[in-house]
A protein has these predicted regions:
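Single conserved hydrophobic/aromatic residue that forms the stacking wall/gate
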Residues: 1-12
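Conserved catalytic core of nucleic-acid polymerases
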Residues: 18-149, 155, 166-169, 196-205
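C-terminal structured "cap/appendage" subdomains that terminate the fold
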Residues: 143-194
Length: 205
């Protein structure tokens, strides 16, 4: 679960508190809106797009976005810098140096340029997350193989890994997952893993 960090609490709940709502009064709807704004921002969402996502007026959506940037000015600077760097170099880059060409930034078509800006904002974030996940997958696979375990990694979905585990190996698999996923890379914030088990994927949710 990437919504939380040890010692930092629920990041989306804290964002909802920015509007002056005491922690105990933050509702699930407020948290959901904060989460939608957070993810929408890194995709370069417009006030129209956010208004559609949250079923609110365009004016309210614009106020959400404006308030977000006022509260987190560093995010605005990062996104603006990401676009400028991509315009200068012709590509966006992840934390690990992987490049994503963004030719749309030079398009004569306004819609294409807007798309390019959204890519330039999002690629360093989502691309870095993908890089980290791939490192974790390689490390988990190697460890399962090293221990000659019967359990196998069978699926990756966004920031989740699905393991088909032998009943006798469940605890050991959990230990491996936590270690390899939380230590895939050292960042200034911790990587936290939540795990669920079940006889099938549905039960594990």
């Amino acid at each position: 679960d990437t919504d939380r960090s040890r010692g930092l609490g629920d990041v989306y709940k804290r964002q909802a508190q920015v509007n002056g709502v005491p922690p105990e009064l933050v509702t699930s709807q407020m948290r959901s809106r904060a989460k939608a704004v957070n993810f929408g921002i890194v995709y370069g969402i417009s006030s129209f797009g956010l208004s559609m996502d949250l079923s609110i007026t365009r004016k309210e959506a614009a106020e959400y976005i404006e308030h977000y940037f006022e509260t987190y000015p560093g995010v605005k600077k990062f996104l603006d810098d990401s676009v400028e760097n991509a315009k200068e170099k012709g590509y966006a880059v992840t934390l690990f140096g992987r490049r994503r060409p963004v030719p749309e930034l030079k398009s004569s078509n306004f819609m294409q340029r807007n798309f390019g800006e959204r890519v330039a904002m999002n690629a360093p974030i989502q691309g870095t997350a993908a890089d980290i996940m791939k490192i974790a997958m390689i490390d988990v696979h190697k460890e399962l193989k090293k221990r000659n375990m019967k359990s196998r990694m069978i699926l990756q979905v966004h920031d989740e890994l699905l393991i088909e585990a032998e009943c006798s190996e469940v605890d050991e698999v959990k230990e491996i997952l936590r270690d390899k996923m939380e230590n895939a890379v050292k960042l200034s914030v911790p990587l936290i893993v939540d795990m669920h088990t079940g006889k099938n994927w549905y039960e594990a949710k």
